[in-house]
């Protein structure tokens, strides 16, 4: 990886773009620049969030025009403070997993990817990582992945598969009002592509739906709780030690937590400090 521009030259280019689209010129502070020649991607690390906002511009116009001008496939703009936060979360996750006494294949591989991400905090790329790091899959199923068909749970299943957990995906099916047919099509396509086992569990959420429509409570908490209970019970019944959820909030010390009967919950995206990006 090499730098395409100096900080000064890049700041000049940014302000030229800002001027062209009617934005005022600003003093922009860039902490660091990383260019991935293979992917033709540029990372701009700013000193603070206002600098990040200045580079992105209203509606993303500045960074979009900058990408076109520099003929770059993709430009990522992050503030240095955000990376410090991410680094801190990753270190906490690594500490938590290092203290988790387990010889599970998937857990050991998760520790490896955590270390690699800490070493390449600015420019870590999952596609490139898994192209050059192919992990042996566990002979036994080590994890159940709660798969809703949405982005977070789908990403969790992909990660679990590539990390060697030999996962089985389980989808709670309360009917089309909660699980539309489009999500079922997404689920089938993904599990087929990954060659991952998958099961549906029929569930009755009618009371939760009825009471929420009557305004008695917000459905998310109760729906989520009931889903977790069903997923956990499936794992216990099948002697599978880990349940994986696509939670992105339970980072660091909460990335893996004990449940009932020796079961553990792993919030896989959160353990890797993955955000909505």
Show which residues each predicted segment covers:
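A short, basic/flexible loop-to-alpha-helix module at the beginning of a structural domain
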Residues: 110-141
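Active-site adenylate/phosphate-handling loop in enzymes that bind or generate adenylated species
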Residues: 208, 214-277
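N-terminal presequence-like segments and adjacent domain-start helices
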Residues: 1-13
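ATP-dependent adenylation/pyrophosphate-handling site
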Residues: 134-188
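A short amphipathic beta-strand at an alpha->beta junction
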Residues: 67-89
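Short edge beta-strands and adjacent turn/loop segments
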Residues: 19-45
């Amino acid at each position: 990886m090499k730098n395409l521009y100096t900080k000064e030259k890049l700041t000049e280019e940014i302000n030229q773009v800002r001027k062209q689209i009617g934005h005022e010129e600003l003093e922009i502070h860039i902490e660091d620049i990383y260019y991935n020649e293979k992917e033709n991607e540029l990372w701009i690390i700013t000193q603070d969030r206002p600098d990040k906002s200045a580079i992105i511009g209203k509606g993303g116009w500045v960074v979009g025009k900058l990408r076109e001008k520099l003929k770059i496939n993709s430009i990522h703009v992050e503030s240095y403070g955000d990376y410090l936060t991410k680094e801190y979360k990753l270190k906490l996750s690594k500490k938590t997993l290092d203290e988790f006494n387990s010889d599970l294949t998937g857990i050991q591989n998760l520790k490896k990817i955590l270390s690699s991400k800490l070493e390449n905090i600015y420019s870590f790329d999952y596609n490139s990582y898994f192209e050059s790091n192919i992990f042996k899959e566990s002979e036994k199923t080590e994890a159940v992945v709660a798969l809703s068909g949405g982005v977070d749970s789908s990403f969790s299943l992909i990660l679990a598969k590539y990390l060697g957990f030999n996962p089985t995906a389980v989808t709670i099916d309360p009917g089309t009002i909660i699980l539309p047919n489009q999500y079922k099509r997404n689920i089938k396509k993904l599990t087929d592509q990954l060659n991952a086992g998958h099961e549906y569990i029929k569930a009755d959420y009618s009371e939760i739906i009825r009471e929420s429509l009557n305004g008695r409570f917000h459905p998310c908490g109760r729906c989520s709780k009931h889903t977790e209970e069903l997923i956990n019970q499936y794992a216990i019944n099948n002697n599978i030690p880990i349940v994986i959820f696509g939670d992105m909030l339970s980072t660091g010390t909460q990335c893996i937590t004990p449940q009932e009967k020796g079961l553990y919950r792993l919030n896989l995206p959160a353990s890797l400090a993955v955000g909505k990006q």
